[in-house]
């Protein structure tokens, strides 16, 4: 009884290491045995897939980083505007308070001619500042976003914006189509060589 040593190839083909390069086991196709011996890293189709994956990863990373930078920029602008609004409100309150006391608007010293103004200054100086409420925050976001979009479209014409957009989409489309066509070409080439063998 003779024991034969077989090894299983990555694609499931059984190969006998004692057989020569051109010899194959019964039931195996010569093309399958040859392909099983090839290194997977030498496959042009696989290399093209990895290059395409790397290209798409780079494009996605650039797009994601630009989106994150845009959001962070707007968030910083919103925070600055909210701080500016709070400072303005504090200045108004300080002005109202100084006018209230300069004009002697305390109820027991108030002059009847200044009754309306004193009431306005009293409301103004007792106003409570709510910094960073959801309403103020949403309003500041909308205002800042509108300003950024307006500034962007004032700097660029519609033609230049469309040109940039179409160029970016075109580069991505052409590159992915080229890699896909190259893989189809390689697969067709491999199937033709199998038919001729």
From Swiss-Prot:
Can you quote a single GO CC term?
A: cell periphery
Q: Which UniProt keywords apply?
A: Membrane, mRNA transport, Nucleus, Transmembrane, Transmembrane helix, Transport
Places the protein is found = Nucleus membrane
Transmembrane helix recorded as keyword: yes
Q: Which SMART domains match?
A: Brr6_like_C_C
Question: What topology does it adopt in the membrane?
Answer: Multi-pass membrane protein
What is its biological role? Required for mRNA nuclear export. Involved in the nuclear pore complex (NPC) distribution and nuclear envelope morphology.
Name the family the entry cites: Belongs to the BRL1/BRR6 family.
Q: Which PANTHER family match?
A: NUCLEUS EXPORT PROTEIN BRR6 (PTHR28136:SF5)
Complex and partners: Interacts with BRL1.
- For this entry, the protein name equals Nucleus export protein BRR6
Q: Which organism is it from?
A: Saccharomyces cerevisiae (strain ATCC 204508 / S288c)
- State the organism's lineage: Eukaryota, Fungi, Dikarya, Ascomycota, Saccharomycotina
């Amino acid at each position: 009884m003779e024991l034969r040593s077989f090894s299983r190839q990555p694609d499931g083909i059984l190969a006998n290491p004692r057989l020569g390069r051109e010899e194959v086991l019964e039931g195996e196709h010569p093309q399958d045995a040859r392909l099983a011996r090839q290194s997977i890293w030498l496959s042009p189709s696989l290399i093209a897939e990895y290059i395409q994956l790397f290209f798409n990863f780079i494009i996605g990373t650039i797009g994601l980083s630009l989106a994150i930078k845009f959001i962070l920029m707007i968030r910083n602008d919103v925070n600055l505007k909210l701080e500016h609004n709070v400072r303005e409100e504090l200045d108004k309150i300080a002005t109202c308070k100084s006018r209230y006391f300069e004009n002697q608007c305390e109820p027991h010293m108030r002059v009847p001619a200044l009754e309306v103004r004193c009431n306005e200054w009293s409301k103004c100086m007792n106003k409570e500042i709510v910094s960073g409420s959801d309403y103020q925050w949403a309003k500041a976001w909308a205002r800042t976003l509108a300003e950024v979009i307006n500034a962007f479209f004032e700097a660029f014409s519609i033609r230049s914006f469309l040109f940039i957009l179409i160029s970016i989409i075109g580069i991505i489309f052409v590159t992915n189509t080229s890699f896909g066509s190259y893989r189809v070409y390689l697969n067709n080439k491999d199937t033709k060589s199998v038919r001729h063998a």
